[in-house]
Amino acid sequence: MRGNIAQLMQQAQKMQENLQKAQEEIAKIEVTGSAGGGMVSVTLTGAKECRKVRIDPSLTSDPEMLEDLIAAAFNDASNKIDAESKSKMGSATAGMQLPPGMKLPF
């Protein structure tokens, strides 16, 4: 019994180390989302901080469309970060059984 508890504790500590490493890796990434066939792009960090917005000058005459494209590009980048985070966090918890419905911090 004690061996099982010790093994579980080691497994949990290893998972915690892996999760911390994955979070550090995620924080370092930059992802670019785009909309309007690439006419608008938004670059976000892994923490979803906006680093850059690029807008094709031809779009400045239609502010409403530009607003929609910026939002779509932001959402595209955000979804890419979510997918990357899920992948990295899944690798960090490989082999560790999480209870049904339990979600990671991301």
From Swiss-Prot:
Q: Where is this region: Disordered?
A: 81-106
Q: Which Pfam families match?
A: YbaB_DNA_bd
Where is the protein found, in the record's own terms?
Cytoplasm, Nucleoid
User: What UniProt keywords apply to this chain's record, in alphabetical order?
Assistant: Cytoplasm, DNA-binding
GO cellular component entries: bacterial nucleoid; cytosol
The lineage's top-level taxon is Bacteria
Instruction: Give this protein's Gene Ontology molecular function annotations.
Output: DNA binding
Functionally, this protein is described as follows: Binds to DNA and alters its conformation. May be involved in regulation of gene expression, nucleoid organization and DNA protection.
The record's similarity note reads:
Belongs to the YbaB/EbfC family.
Q: How does it assemble?
A: Homodimer.
Listed name of the protein:
Nucleoid-associated protein Smlt1015
